[in-house]
Amino acid sequence: MNIIKNWFKDNGYEVDEYETTLQAKTDTILFLVVKPHNGTNGKWMLRVAALVSFDRWANSTAVEEFFNTETGLRNYLENNQLYIYKDVLRSLSEEYEEMYRVNYED
């Protein structure tokens, strides 16, 4: 997982690496990278969430993508950073809109 870990470190993310996963974060966003295993059909998995609304991955994932190779995942991060952040912002906006409806429209 060194290719991905180095990419995050080179781009200013705080990185925590475990046996089969890597978490990278800034003050606003959290990334989870999972090594291939049976649960991911042998693919690398990337999940991304806003830190402010993070509860657990099952409830908070704004982006979830799968890749055949570690290099493919790294290239996706490199080439799609703006789109990843846009998707996280869109997801966060939808969450706040739902909270507003629950609190003020019911």
Spans of features found by a protein language model:
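Negatively charged, low-complexity tracts enriched in Asp/Glu with abundant Ser/Thr
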Residues: 1-27, 57-60, 94, 98-106
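Amphipathic, interaction-prone secondary-structure segments
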Residues: 11-54
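Weak global preference for isoleucine
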Residues: 3-4, 29, 33-34, 84
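Mixed-charge, Lys/Arg-enriched low-complexity segments
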Residues: 52-106
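Acidic, low-complexity intrinsically disordered regions
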Residues: 3-4, 11, 40, 53, ...
